[in-house]
Design a protein with these regions (language model features):
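Conserved Class I S-adenosyl-L-methionine-dependent methyltransferase catalytic core
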Residues: 4-50, 54-134
Length: 134
Protein backbone atom coordinates (compact mmCIF):
# COMPACT_ATOMS: atom_id res chain seq x y z
CA UNK A 1 0.00 0.00 0.00
CA UNK A 2 1.41 3.37 -0.97
CA UNK A 3 1.93 5.87 1.79
CA UNK A 4 -0.44 8.79 1.46
CA UNK A 5 1.22 11.99 2.69
CA UNK A 6 -0.53 13.62 5.68
CA UNK A 7 -1.50 16.78 3.73
CA UNK A 8 -3.22 14.63 1.09
CA UNK A 9 -4.97 12.59 3.79
CA UNK A 10 -6.21 15.79 5.43
CA UNK A 11 -7.36 17.14 2.07
CA UNK A 12 -9.43 13.98 1.60
CA UNK A 13 -10.95 14.34 5.07
CA UNK A 14 -11.75 18.03 4.69
CA UNK A 15 -13.35 17.61 1.26
CA UNK A 16 -15.29 14.41 2.06
CA UNK A 17 -18.55 16.34 2.13
CA UNK A 18 -18.10 17.04 -1.58
CA UNK A 19 -18.47 13.32 -2.22
CA UNK A 20 -21.59 13.14 -0.05
CA UNK A 21 -23.17 15.93 -2.09
CA UNK A 22 -22.12 14.27 -5.36
CA UNK A 23 -23.74 10.99 -4.29
CA UNK A 24 -26.89 12.81 -3.17
CA UNK A 25 -27.10 14.66 -6.48
CA UNK A 26 -26.55 11.47 -8.48
CA UNK A 27 -29.24 9.73 -6.43
CA UNK A 28 -31.76 12.59 -6.65
CA UNK A 29 -31.31 12.86 -10.41
CA UNK A 30 -31.61 9.09 -10.80
CA UNK A 31 -28.40 8.83 -12.82
CA UNK A 32 -27.77 5.15 -12.05
CA UNK A 33 -31.38 4.29 -12.94
CA UNK A 34 -30.97 6.20 -16.20
CA UNK A 35 -27.97 4.01 -17.09
CA UNK A 36 -29.71 0.76 -16.13
CA UNK A 37 -30.08 -0.38 -19.76
CA UNK A 38 -26.50 0.48 -20.68
CA UNK A 39 -24.08 3.33 -21.42
CA UNK A 40 -25.40 6.69 -22.59
CA UNK A 41 -23.85 9.95 -23.74
CA UNK A 42 -24.10 12.74 -21.21
CA UNK A 43 -26.46 14.74 -23.47
CA UNK A 44 -28.92 11.82 -23.45
CA UNK A 45 -28.64 11.46 -19.69
CA UNK A 46 -29.20 15.20 -19.24
CA UNK A 47 -32.33 15.14 -21.40
CA UNK A 48 -33.71 12.14 -19.52
CA UNK A 49 -33.12 13.56 -16.04
CA UNK A 50 -33.84 17.22 -16.87
CA UNK A 51 -30.35 18.60 -16.27
CA UNK A 52 -27.94 20.95 -18.01
CA UNK A 53 -25.58 18.77 -20.06
CA UNK A 54 -22.42 20.77 -19.28
CA UNK A 55 -23.09 20.86 -15.54
CA UNK A 56 -24.05 17.18 -15.55
CA UNK A 57 -20.85 16.28 -17.38
CA UNK A 58 -18.82 17.90 -14.59
CA UNK A 59 -20.81 16.00 -11.96
CA UNK A 60 -20.42 12.71 -13.83
CA UNK A 61 -16.65 13.29 -14.17
CA UNK A 62 -16.40 14.04 -10.45
CA UNK A 63 -18.36 10.88 -9.64
CA UNK A 64 -16.05 8.91 -11.93
CA UNK A 65 -13.02 10.37 -10.12
CA UNK A 66 -14.23 8.79 -6.86
CA UNK A 67 -15.03 5.45 -8.50
CA UNK A 68 -18.76 5.91 -9.13
CA UNK A 69 -19.72 5.38 -12.80
CA UNK A 70 -17.32 4.64 -15.65
CA UNK A 71 -16.52 7.13 -18.39
CA UNK A 72 -16.11 5.78 -21.89
CA UNK A 73 -15.31 7.62 -25.14
CA UNK A 74 -17.29 10.63 -26.36
CA UNK A 75 -18.70 11.72 -23.00
CA UNK A 76 -20.41 8.37 -22.55
CA UNK A 77 -20.99 6.96 -19.08
CA UNK A 78 -21.93 3.55 -17.73
CA UNK A 79 -22.80 2.06 -14.38
CA UNK A 80 -20.20 0.11 -12.46
CA UNK A 81 -20.47 -1.97 -9.28
CA UNK A 82 -20.42 1.11 -7.06
CA UNK A 83 -22.94 3.17 -9.03
CA UNK A 84 -25.28 0.16 -9.10
CA UNK A 85 -25.84 0.81 -5.38
CA UNK A 86 -27.48 4.13 -6.31
CA UNK A 87 -30.17 2.41 -8.39
CA UNK A 88 -33.64 2.50 -6.89
CA UNK A 89 -34.75 -0.99 -7.85
CA UNK A 90 -31.95 -3.26 -6.63
CA UNK A 91 -31.51 -5.21 -3.40
CA UNK A 92 -29.24 -3.32 -1.04
CA UNK A 93 -29.87 0.01 -2.77
CA UNK A 94 -28.18 2.95 -1.06
CA UNK A 95 -30.09 5.54 -3.12
CA UNK A 96 -32.43 6.70 -0.36
CA UNK A 97 -29.58 6.73 2.15
CA UNK A 98 -27.51 8.96 -0.16
CA UNK A 99 -30.47 11.30 -0.58
CA UNK A 100 -31.13 11.45 3.16
CA UNK A 101 -27.51 11.94 4.22
CA UNK A 102 -26.99 14.76 1.73
CA UNK A 103 -30.23 16.54 2.68
CA UNK A 104 -30.12 19.79 4.68
CA UNK A 105 -31.65 18.15 7.76
CA UNK A 106 -28.60 15.93 8.07
CA UNK A 107 -25.77 18.28 7.20
CA UNK A 108 -26.90 21.67 8.52
CA UNK A 109 -26.57 20.72 12.21
CA UNK A 110 -22.95 19.74 11.52
CA UNK A 111 -22.28 23.36 10.51
CA UNK A 112 -22.92 24.26 14.14
CA UNK A 113 -20.69 21.59 15.71
CA UNK A 114 -18.08 24.03 17.06
CA UNK A 115 -20.80 26.03 18.83
CA UNK A 116 -22.37 22.85 20.21
CA UNK A 117 -19.02 21.79 21.67
CA UNK A 118 -18.45 25.24 23.17
CA UNK A 119 -21.92 25.59 24.67
CA UNK A 120 -22.75 21.96 25.38
CA UNK A 121 -26.18 22.56 23.85
CA UNK A 122 -27.92 21.18 20.81
CA UNK A 123 -27.74 23.51 17.84
CA UNK A 124 -30.51 21.80 15.89
CA UNK A 125 -32.92 24.68 16.46
CA UNK A 126 -30.39 27.25 15.26
CA UNK A 127 -29.54 25.13 12.22
CA UNK A 128 -33.00 23.86 11.29
CA UNK A 129 -35.49 26.18 12.97
CA UNK A 130 -36.74 23.37 15.24
CA UNK A 131 -35.43 20.58 17.44
CA UNK A 132 -34.67 17.24 15.84
CA UNK A 133 -37.39 15.45 17.77
CA UNK A 134 -40.44 17.50 18.61
Amino acid sequence: MDHVPPPQQMFQHVTAYWVTQLMGTAARLGLADCLEAGPLRVAEIATTVGANADALYRVMRACTAVGVFTEQADKTFANNALSQTLRSNVPGSMRNFAIAQSAPGHWRPWEQLTEAVRSGKSTAHAALGHELFE
